[in-house]
Amino acid sequence: MTRASPAAAQTPEHRPGTVADDPAATAADAWKGVAAAAVVVLCWSGFNIVSRFGSTGAFTPFDMAALRYAVSATLALPFFIRDIPVAQYPRYFTLALFGGLGYALFAYSGFALAPSTHAGVFVNGGIPFWTAVLLALTTGLQRSRKIVVSLLLTTTGLVLITAESLFAPLEPGQWLGDVLFLCAAASWAIFGLLVRRWQPGARNAVVGIAGISAVIYLPIYVLWLPKTIQSAEWGDLALQGIYQGIVAALLAAGMYAYATARIGASRASMALALVPAVSAVGAYALLDEPISLLAGVGIVVVSAGAGLGAWAPRRKAAV
Protein backbone atom coordinates (compact mmCIF):
# COMPACT_ATOMS: atom_id res chain seq x y z
CA MET A 1 0.00 0.00 0.00
CA THR A 2 1.41 3.38 -1.04
CA ARG A 3 1.45 6.36 1.24
CA ALA A 4 0.63 9.89 0.19
CA SER A 5 3.63 12.17 0.13
CA PRO A 6 3.74 15.00 2.66
CA ALA A 7 3.39 17.53 -0.16
CA ALA A 8 0.23 15.88 -1.40
CA ALA A 9 -1.32 16.04 2.03
CA GLN A 10 -0.64 19.73 2.42
CA THR A 11 -3.07 22.46 1.50
CA PRO A 12 -2.05 24.87 -1.28
CA GLU A 13 -0.89 27.47 1.19
CA HIS A 14 1.54 25.00 2.80
CA ARG A 15 3.07 23.46 -0.31
CA PRO A 16 6.67 24.35 -1.19
CA GLY A 17 6.86 26.59 -4.22
CA THR A 18 3.63 28.45 -3.51
CA VAL A 19 3.53 32.16 -2.79
CA ALA A 20 3.78 31.55 0.94
CA ASP A 21 7.02 29.57 0.69
CA ASP A 22 8.90 31.24 -2.19
CA PRO A 23 11.09 34.01 -0.72
CA ALA A 24 11.85 35.46 -4.16
CA ALA A 25 8.16 35.97 -4.89
CA THR A 26 6.96 36.88 -1.42
CA ALA A 27 7.58 40.64 -1.44
CA ALA A 28 6.22 41.30 -4.92
CA ASP A 29 3.21 39.08 -4.42
CA ALA A 30 2.52 40.60 -1.03
CA TRP A 31 2.39 44.10 -2.50
CA LYS A 32 0.14 42.90 -5.33
CA GLY A 33 -2.14 41.23 -2.81
CA VAL A 34 -2.29 44.31 -0.59
CA ALA A 35 -3.04 46.49 -3.63
CA ALA A 36 -5.86 44.15 -4.64
CA ALA A 37 -7.23 44.24 -1.09
CA ALA A 38 -7.12 48.06 -1.19
CA VAL A 39 -9.25 48.01 -4.35
CA VAL A 40 -11.75 45.78 -2.54
CA VAL A 41 -11.86 48.23 0.39
CA LEU A 42 -12.80 51.06 -1.97
CA CYS A 43 -15.36 48.95 -3.84
CA TRP A 44 -17.02 47.66 -0.68
CA SER A 45 -17.10 51.07 0.96
CA GLY A 46 -19.20 52.26 -1.95
CA PHE A 47 -21.16 49.00 -1.90
CA ASN A 48 -22.36 49.64 1.64
CA ILE A 49 -23.60 53.13 0.76
CA VAL A 50 -25.16 52.24 -2.61
CA SER A 51 -26.86 49.14 -1.19
CA ARG A 52 -28.31 51.04 1.77
CA PHE A 53 -29.61 53.69 -0.63
CA GLY A 54 -31.29 51.05 -2.78
CA SER A 55 -32.70 48.98 0.07
CA THR A 56 -34.38 52.00 1.67
CA GLY A 57 -35.69 53.23 -1.69
CA ALA A 58 -37.51 51.53 -4.53
CA PHE A 59 -35.93 48.09 -4.27
CA THR A 60 -36.52 44.99 -2.18
CA PRO A 61 -33.47 42.93 -1.17
CA PHE A 62 -34.53 40.42 -3.81
CA ASP A 63 -34.52 43.14 -6.48
CA MET A 64 -30.97 44.08 -5.52
CA ALA A 65 -29.77 40.50 -5.83
CA ALA A 66 -31.55 40.14 -9.19
CA LEU A 67 -29.81 43.24 -10.56
CA ARG A 68 -26.48 41.99 -9.23
CA TYR A 69 -26.65 38.65 -11.01
CA ALA A 70 -28.55 39.68 -14.14
CA VAL A 71 -25.85 42.21 -15.01
CA SER A 72 -22.84 40.18 -13.87
CA ALA A 73 -24.04 36.98 -15.54
CA THR A 74 -24.61 38.78 -18.83
CA LEU A 75 -20.90 39.53 -18.88
CA ALA A 76 -19.60 36.39 -17.19
CA LEU A 77 -21.79 33.51 -18.36
CA PRO A 78 -20.18 33.13 -21.83
CA PHE A 79 -16.74 32.74 -20.20
CA PHE A 80 -18.15 30.32 -17.64
CA ILE A 81 -19.63 28.08 -20.34
CA ARG A 82 -16.42 28.23 -22.39
CA ASP A 83 -13.77 27.88 -19.69
CA ILE A 84 -15.19 25.88 -16.76
CA PRO A 85 -15.21 22.07 -17.18
CA VAL A 86 -18.51 20.42 -16.32
CA ALA A 87 -16.73 18.17 -13.84
CA GLN A 88 -15.87 21.25 -11.76
CA TYR A 89 -19.43 22.61 -11.62
CA PRO A 90 -20.08 21.23 -8.10
CA ARG A 91 -17.05 23.12 -6.78
CA TYR A 92 -18.22 26.37 -8.37
CA PHE A 93 -21.74 25.74 -7.11
CA THR A 94 -20.30 25.69 -3.59
CA LEU A 95 -18.37 28.92 -4.21
CA ALA A 96 -21.54 30.55 -5.56
CA LEU A 97 -23.56 29.36 -2.58
CA PHE A 98 -21.30 31.17 -0.11
CA GLY A 99 -19.62 33.97 -2.09
CA GLY A 100 -22.65 34.68 -4.24
CA LEU A 101 -26.20 33.95 -3.10
CA GLY A 102 -25.55 33.53 0.61
CA TYR A 103 -23.48 36.67 0.97
CA ALA A 104 -25.68 38.86 -1.24
CA LEU A 105 -29.07 37.88 0.17
CA PHE A 106 -27.93 38.18 3.78
CA ALA A 107 -26.29 41.54 3.10
CA TYR A 108 -29.16 43.09 1.13
CA SER A 109 -31.71 41.95 3.70
CA GLY A 110 -29.56 43.51 6.42
CA PHE A 111 -29.42 46.83 4.58
CA ALA A 112 -33.23 47.02 4.72
CA LEU A 113 -33.08 46.99 8.54
CA ALA A 114 -29.80 48.55 9.66
CA PRO A 115 -27.69 51.55 8.56
CA SER A 116 -24.65 51.27 6.34
CA THR A 117 -22.28 52.08 9.22
CA HIS A 118 -23.38 48.82 10.85
CA ALA A 119 -22.74 46.95 7.60
CA GLY A 120 -19.25 48.39 7.49
CA VAL A 121 -18.55 46.97 10.94
CA PHE A 122 -20.47 43.70 10.98
CA VAL A 123 -19.77 42.57 7.41
CA ASN A 124 -16.26 43.84 6.80
CA GLY A 125 -15.23 43.68 10.44
CA GLY A 126 -16.91 40.30 10.82
CA ILE A 127 -15.14 38.66 7.89
CA PRO A 128 -11.68 38.55 9.56
CA PHE A 129 -13.31 37.41 12.80
CA TRP A 130 -15.08 34.49 11.13
CA THR A 131 -12.01 33.70 9.02
CA ALA A 132 -9.87 33.35 12.15
CA VAL A 133 -12.53 31.26 13.91
CA LEU A 134 -12.92 28.93 10.94
CA LEU A 135 -9.16 28.57 10.53
CA ALA A 136 -8.79 27.70 14.20
CA LEU A 137 -11.60 25.12 13.99
CA THR A 138 -10.47 23.49 10.76
CA THR A 139 -6.67 23.67 10.90
CA GLY A 140 -5.75 24.41 14.51
CA LEU A 141 -3.25 26.99 13.30
CA GLN A 142 -1.66 29.18 15.93
CA ARG A 143 -1.95 32.90 15.34
CA SER A 144 0.85 35.44 15.77
CA ARG A 145 0.64 37.91 18.64
CA LYS A 146 -0.26 40.76 16.31
CA ILE A 147 -3.06 38.74 14.73
CA VAL A 148 -4.47 37.92 18.16
CA VAL A 149 -4.34 41.57 19.21
CA SER A 150 -5.96 42.66 15.96
CA LEU A 151 -8.79 40.17 16.44
CA LEU A 152 -9.33 41.40 19.99
CA LEU A 153 -9.54 44.97 18.72
CA THR A 154 -11.95 43.95 15.96
CA THR A 155 -14.14 42.06 18.42
CA THR A 156 -14.14 45.00 20.83
CA GLY A 157 -15.33 47.30 18.08
CA LEU A 158 -18.09 44.87 17.13
CA VAL A 159 -19.24 44.73 20.75
CA LEU A 160 -19.43 48.53 20.89
CA ILE A 161 -21.59 48.68 17.78
CA THR A 162 -23.73 45.78 18.98
CA ALA A 163 -24.50 47.54 22.25
CA GLU A 164 -25.69 50.62 20.40
CA SER A 165 -27.87 48.60 18.03
CA LEU A 166 -29.49 46.31 20.58
CA PHE A 167 -30.51 49.10 22.94
CA ALA A 168 -31.33 51.88 20.49
CA PRO A 169 -34.94 52.88 21.34
CA LEU A 170 -35.77 54.46 17.99
CA GLU A 171 -34.88 51.47 15.82
CA PRO A 172 -35.30 48.30 17.88
CA GLY A 173 -35.25 46.10 14.78
CA GLN A 174 -31.67 46.98 13.96
CA TRP A 175 -30.42 43.94 15.83
CA LEU A 176 -31.91 41.65 13.15
CA GLY A 177 -30.12 43.59 10.44
CA ASP A 178 -26.88 43.20 12.39
CA VAL A 179 -27.42 39.43 12.67
CA LEU A 180 -27.97 39.25 8.91
CA PHE A 181 -24.76 41.21 8.37
CA LEU A 182 -22.86 38.73 10.55
CA CYS A 183 -24.33 35.86 8.51
CA ALA A 184 -23.15 37.60 5.33
CA ALA A 185 -19.67 37.93 6.85
CA ALA A 186 -19.57 34.24 7.77
CA SER A 187 -20.67 33.29 4.27
CA TRP A 188 -17.94 35.40 2.67
CA ALA A 189 -15.30 34.08 5.08
CA ILE A 190 -16.13 30.53 4.01
CA PHE A 191 -15.88 31.61 0.38
CA GLY A 192 -12.45 33.15 0.95
CA LEU A 193 -11.09 30.02 2.62
CA LEU A 194 -12.46 27.83 -0.17
CA VAL A 195 -10.84 30.05 -2.79
CA ARG A 196 -7.53 29.83 -0.95
CA ARG A 197 -7.77 26.04 -0.73
CA TRP A 198 -9.07 25.28 -4.24
CA GLN A 199 -7.13 28.01 -6.12
CA PRO A 200 -9.63 28.43 -8.99
CA GLY A 201 -8.03 31.68 -10.16
CA ALA A 202 -9.60 35.11 -9.78
CA ARG A 203 -11.34 35.15 -13.16
CA ASN A 204 -12.76 31.65 -12.88
CA ALA A 205 -13.99 32.36 -9.35
CA VAL A 206 -15.79 35.49 -10.52
CA VAL A 207 -17.43 34.02 -13.61
CA GLY A 208 -18.35 30.86 -11.70
CA ILE A 209 -20.11 32.79 -8.94
CA ALA A 210 -21.92 35.09 -11.35
CA GLY A 211 -22.99 32.38 -13.77
CA ILE A 212 -24.23 29.79 -11.29
CA SER A 213 -25.88 32.36 -9.01
CA ALA A 214 -27.85 33.78 -11.94
CA VAL A 215 -28.96 30.38 -13.21
CA ILE A 216 -30.21 29.40 -9.75
CA TYR A 217 -31.60 32.68 -8.49
CA LEU A 218 -33.18 34.56 -11.40
CA PRO A 219 -35.91 31.97 -12.23
CA ILE A 220 -36.91 31.83 -8.55
CA TYR A 221 -36.95 35.63 -8.38
CA VAL A 222 -39.09 36.04 -11.51
CA LEU A 223 -41.63 33.39 -10.53
CA TRP A 224 -42.05 33.70 -6.78
CA LEU A 225 -40.18 36.45 -4.93
CA PRO A 226 -41.69 39.86 -4.05
CA LYS A 227 -40.45 42.69 -6.23
CA THR A 228 -40.88 46.45 -6.61
CA ILE A 229 -38.30 46.95 -9.32
CA GLN A 230 -40.95 47.98 -11.82
CA SER A 231 -41.53 51.24 -9.92
CA ALA A 232 -37.86 52.24 -9.84
CA GLU A 233 -36.56 55.13 -11.91
CA TRP A 234 -34.10 54.49 -14.70
CA GLY A 235 -31.33 56.37 -12.92
CA ASP A 236 -31.69 54.18 -9.83
CA LEU A 237 -31.75 51.05 -11.98
CA ALA A 238 -28.57 52.11 -13.76
CA LEU A 239 -26.79 52.95 -10.49
CA GLN A 240 -27.67 49.66 -8.82
CA GLY A 241 -27.14 47.56 -11.92
CA ILE A 242 -23.68 48.95 -12.63
CA TYR A 243 -22.47 48.99 -9.04
CA GLN A 244 -23.98 45.71 -7.90
CA GLY A 245 -23.42 43.79 -11.12
CA ILE A 246 -20.02 45.09 -12.21
CA VAL A 247 -18.20 46.82 -9.34
CA ALA A 248 -19.35 44.53 -6.50
CA ALA A 249 -19.99 41.18 -8.20
CA LEU A 250 -17.10 41.22 -10.69
CA LEU A 251 -14.40 43.72 -9.73
CA ALA A 252 -14.52 43.41 -5.93
CA ALA A 253 -15.01 39.64 -5.91
CA GLY A 254 -12.20 39.15 -8.42
CA MET A 255 -9.80 41.37 -6.51
CA TYR A 256 -10.62 39.57 -3.26
CA ALA A 257 -9.96 36.19 -4.84
CA TYR A 258 -6.65 37.54 -6.18
CA ALA A 259 -5.66 39.03 -2.82
CA THR A 260 -6.52 35.78 -1.04
CA ALA A 261 -4.30 33.82 -3.42
CA ARG A 262 -1.40 36.25 -2.91
CA ILE A 263 -1.43 37.09 0.80
CA GLY A 264 -3.74 34.48 2.30
CA ALA A 265 -7.33 34.54 3.49
CA SER A 266 -6.40 35.81 6.95
CA ARG A 267 -4.53 38.93 5.84
CA ALA A 268 -6.92 39.68 2.98
CA SER A 269 -9.90 39.54 5.32
CA MET A 270 -8.14 41.79 7.84
CA ALA A 271 -7.71 44.47 5.19
CA LEU A 272 -11.47 44.47 4.58
CA ALA A 273 -12.14 45.64 8.10
CA LEU A 274 -10.76 49.02 7.05
CA VAL A 275 -14.05 49.54 5.21
CA PRO A 276 -16.07 50.81 8.24
CA ALA A 277 -14.26 54.12 8.51
CA VAL A 278 -14.62 54.82 4.80
CA SER A 279 -18.27 53.69 4.79
CA ALA A 280 -19.17 55.77 7.83
CA VAL A 281 -17.70 58.95 6.39
CA GLY A 282 -19.38 58.31 3.04
CA ALA A 283 -22.75 57.55 4.63
CA TYR A 284 -22.51 60.70 6.73
CA ALA A 285 -21.73 62.80 3.66
CA LEU A 286 -24.14 61.19 1.19
CA LEU A 287 -26.98 59.67 3.23
CA ASP A 288 -27.05 62.02 6.24
CA GLU A 289 -26.62 59.04 8.59
CA PRO A 290 -25.29 60.32 11.93
CA ILE A 291 -22.30 58.73 13.63
CA SER A 292 -22.79 58.47 17.37
CA LEU A 293 -19.87 58.63 19.78
CA LEU A 294 -20.17 54.92 20.58
CA ALA A 295 -20.35 53.95 16.91
CA GLY A 296 -17.43 56.21 16.09
CA VAL A 297 -15.27 54.63 18.78
CA GLY A 298 -16.23 51.16 17.55
CA ILE A 299 -15.37 52.05 13.97
CA VAL A 300 -11.96 53.40 14.97
CA VAL A 301 -11.19 50.30 17.07
CA VAL A 302 -12.25 47.89 14.32
CA SER A 303 -10.24 49.77 11.71
CA ALA A 304 -7.15 49.77 13.95
CA GLY A 305 -7.46 46.02 14.45
CA ALA A 306 -7.87 45.50 10.71
CA GLY A 307 -4.79 47.50 9.87
CA LEU A 308 -2.69 45.68 12.47
CA GLY A 309 -3.81 42.29 11.19
CA ALA A 310 -3.41 43.06 7.51
CA TRP A 311 0.17 44.21 7.93
CA ALA A 312 1.23 41.68 10.56
CA PRO A 313 4.47 39.82 9.77
CA ARG A 314 3.99 36.85 7.45
CA ARG A 315 4.77 33.38 8.71
CA LYS A 316 6.10 30.65 6.54
CA ALA A 317 2.61 29.57 5.52
CA ALA A 318 0.15 32.25 4.64
CA VAL A 319 -3.44 31.36 5.31
Feature map (PLM): residue ranges:
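Helix-helix packing/entry segments at the starts of transmembrane helices
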Residues: 67, 104, 119-126, 194-215, ...
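Hydrophobic transmembrane alpha-helices of multi-pass small-molecule transport proteins
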Residues: 76, 95, 143-165, 217, ...
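Transmembrane alpha-helical segments that form core, pore/gating elements
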Residues: 73-76, 130-137, 151, 167-226, ...
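Specific alpha-helical transmembrane segments that line the substrate/conduction pathway
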Residues: 63-74, 99, 108-142, 184, ...
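Hydrophobic/aromatic residues within transmembrane alpha-helices
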Residues: 54, 64, 110, 137-143, ...
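Specific transmembrane alpha-helical segments of multi-pass solute transporters/efflux pumps
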Residues: 43-50, 77-124, 160, 245-263
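Juxtamembrane helix-entry segments on the extracytoplasmic side of multipass membrane proteins
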Residues: 29-33, 57-66, 85-90, 163-186, ...
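Glycine-/small-residue-enriched transmembrane alpha-helix faces in small-molecule transporters
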Residues: 2-63, 156, 166-197, 215-216
